Structures are given as structure tokens and as C-alpha cells.
Amino acid sequence: MNISENALKVLERRYFQKNENGECIENWQDMVLRVASNIAGGDKEKTQRYINLLDSGYFLPNSPTLMNAGNDLQQLSACFVLPVEDSIEGIFESVKNAALIHKSGGGTGFSFSRLREQNARVRSTNGVSSGPISFLSVFNAATDAVKQGGTRRGANMAILNVDHPDILEFITCKEDINNLTNFNISVGITEEFMQAVHDDQEYPLVSPHSGEITQKIKATEVFNLIVEMAHKNGEPGIVFIDRINDYNPTPQVGAMESTNPCGEQPLLPNEACNLGSMNLALLWEDNEFNWDRLQQVVYDSVDFLDDVINRSQFPLQAIDYTVKQNRKIGLGVMGWADLLYEMKIPYNSDEATLLAAKLMEFIDYHSKLKSIKLAEQQGSFPNFKGSIYSQGTLHRKGELDWDMLRNDISSKGIRNATTTTIAPTGTISMIANTSSGVEPQFSLVYVKNVMDGEKLLYVNPHFEKAMHDAGLYSEEMMIKVAETGSIQEMSKIPAEIREVFVTSHDITPEWHIRMQAAFQKFVDNAVSKTINFTNEA
């Protein structure tokens, strides 16, 4: 894989191993060998297969795997969910555990819905509770104090269910953008609440400690406050917690109550998941999409991610146990926007959403075929009995033979409780020099200021080629494009180029959502997606 100047700087700063003086003692090939050989666990055939997989750039695992495989930490997962119990001991146990996870490069999600509301009686002290929002500040301060593995600051997700008595305070707790800067916050939305919004009815707020209704409030007022705050500064988000649990693969183990910080990975309390993403843009070869290569990359990637579970050293025994009982992995994609540029398909088109669904169905289907094969060789995940799979349930309907797959899982088992997740891929897509996740490109051209006041132009290579092919490329033109990052108002550029080379702000929110829905149909977990609005929205 060709490593760009930007990618090399990121790798040197955050990924390559260093000596006691902070000097890099690795290059790209060294890192690939370190990671591949460690995950393969001494298997020579696998080591070579994993070297080829990573070095080609077809697949990259999440950052903690690249950073920590083969070193003393050996903490390889990106996503964690921790329980927060309704006691001082339980709360500060979670603070400590989150600090350990952040130190090793992971992100944490929490539900604060178990904590009793503000001013609720605390019998042991004959005092009153300060409520969940006050403890958010404690978690936030602890995150500030622990810089992740010396490489990146920790990230958190806080969820409070919509029927918690402190929900109004929670919805507005980030109105000041300087508050809780290490947290994304989301309201846990239920079907009952949405029905009350639809019917313009009141709904009950219930004390998690006593189970008593503390008051009833208008659902529309709460919903409108969520919308108002989200419009003001992007928070809170909403998490459809009932819907998440409708698709919980192991309901017999417990309910999922939170996600990771970016929202694409719902997990049980004390559970973690390791993710990895395939670069779709590299699969456009000689003016056609290489489906055979994609199939092989899927098989090798599932193998790799399953081995990551075996090689991980988790910071807590409880996490190690839950992870190995469910063996969840999250295989996703990056380079989607660049693939569409190569194929000359507009992102905001039916052709693109149909291709998205076809691609993701193929990936999801073959990831499960490989997981079935691994189950035949090494056994199903231990919580298979009682899971949706043991009951012949698989929420899929598409062009491929899902009935056959469903029957195979019932009879042969499956190695992993989930196989697919679409992550944001912010840093690994930069390393791979491709577009992130399933997002459109943010800008076609941008200017970077370097030393001595020099300015460097960075032009999307697919756009650059299209402009050269049309005989329109010039540095002056690229500087003009860099002013907005978009070409939609530039009449000198032919319409057929403008239609294909759209950027995130050229695409209406409706098309962003259609694209997300097309991928989500064939994803076990969720899709991390940004919906861009105009400044006037």
C-alpha cells in the first residue's frame, strides 16, 4: 500500500512503536509484520495471509489493534460498554474501569439510567442523591486526566432513558458547549414514548430506585426540547433502545443499554467489540468491481477479527468473560465515496443506494458463511444456546439465499454473535488514503499551510483524474474549488462531472438517510453516519 505523507505523519505520531526516547523504531512493513504475526499466534500460513491482507490496504483493523498488538498492553478492542450501578462504590468502580480502558486506547459507553434521580433519598447516609448528571462531570474529569495510551484522549457515550426523572436536565446538560467535552450524550427512546409523542399524550417518569412514578409530562414537550437542543449544538442524540434490543442476538444473557461513543456498536454491560474495515475503492479493478476478491477479503477479515478476540488482553475479567461468551466482531467498509467516484455514480442517486444494499448484503452474507465455517472448526460462541440463532431467527431478507444460511446456522452453529458494523474509520481511512466509512467526501480540494508560509494543494485523486481527462485541470481552478470544496456552482465544469463529484454539503439530508438505510438493512450492529444540513436549516 502506498503511504501518503499525511498517513505517515499519523503513523509516526500514534501507531509506530517507539523507544525510551520517543523515537520511532518501526516503519509500515514492521508494523504490519508485528500486527499480523501477533494476531496469527504463531501460525505461519495465517501470518502470511494477514500480512498480505494488511499490506495491500484491502483491510485495516481498529486503531487499538494496530497500536497495541505485540506490545505489553495487548488491548486490541475499540468499543466498550460498562455498567454504572446505583451506589457510590459502583459509580467509582466504573470511573476506575473507564480510566483503564481509555489508557489502553478504547472508548466507553454507559447508561446512567440505573442511578436514582436528584434529591431521591439515600437511606445509608440519610441524605439525598445528587443525580446522574452530577456524576457525568466526574467521569468527564477522569477522562481529561487520562490521555489514551499517550496517543488520543478518551471518548464516552452517556445514555439516559427518556422515562428517567432527570431527563429534562440531561437533555440540556450540554447546552454550554464547554460542558462534558469528553461525552456524546443520547436519550434512550422507547416505543411507548414515541407513541405518546404521536398521540400528543403525557407519559410517566419513573424512579429507577423505587419504581414509583414521580410525575407525568407531555411527550411532545420533551421531544421538542430534544430537537431544540440538537439543532442548537448537535446534542443530545437519540438511541432507539427498544429497537436495539429487538435485534439483540443474545436476549437470554441480558438487555443492551448503551453503545460505544460513536453509536455504531450496541453492547451488553461489560462487553467489548473489535472492528475492522475493508477499502471498497481498491476493489474497482480494470473498470469493473472485483466481487471474487471482495469475497476473499471478507473471509480473511472475519478470520483476523475472530483471532483478535483470542489474542486480546482485556483490562477487566468481567469484560474478558462476556466478550468470549459472545465473540462479537464488527466488519465494515471505508472508501465508499471514492468507489462511487471511480464508478461515476452520484452518491445522491438510486443507483448508489441500490449498489450499497447489494454490496452490504454480499459482505454480511459471506461474513456469516465464514463464521459458520469457523464454528464447524472451533465451535460456536458459548452463548449460542438460547440466542436468536439457535431458534432459527435471522433478521434478513434480500437477493441471496438467506433461508439456506439460516438453516446452516441452526444446524452447524456460528462463531460470532455479530459480524458486521460500519464505523466512522476516521484515522484508519486516512492511513488507507481513502474516504471514511460510508460518508461522502467532505471536500474535493483543500489547501494545507506548511512551514515558511508555503501552501500545498490536496486534490482528491479521482477528481483530479476526471479534470485531467476533460482537459480542465489547472492549479488556478483547484484553488477556486478549495474555497468551498464543492464544484456545484462552477458552470465551467461539465454537468456530468458535477453530478458525480458531490460532497457532503451538496447532498440533502434525505439522501444521507437513504444511504444509511441501504447499508443498515444488512448490518448486525449499526452504521456511524453524519447527516449534513445547510447553515440555514
Task: Locate the predicted segments by residue.
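Terminal amphipathic helices with adjacent charged low-complexity linkers/tails
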Residues: 6-12, 172, 187-193, 198, ...
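A structural-propensity feature for long, helix-poor, extended segments
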Residues: 117-156, 285-313, 368-372, 451-498, ...
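Internal maturation/activation junctions in enzymes
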Residues: 297-320, 345-425, 493-500, 514, ...
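Flexible, glycine/charged-enriched surface loops at secondary-structure junctions
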Residues: 45-50, 107-110, 150-157, 237-240, ...
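Core structural elements
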Residues: 3-11, 53-69, 162, 300-311, ...
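Active-site cavity-forming subdomains of large catalytic enzyme subunits
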Residues: 77-291, 314, 318-321, 367, ...
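Acidic/polar, glycine-rich intrinsically disordered N-terminal extensions of enzymes
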Residues: 1-76, 82, 223-225, 232
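Catalytic alpha/beta core of large soluble enzyme barrels
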Residues: 264-266, 305-310, 408-415, 420-537
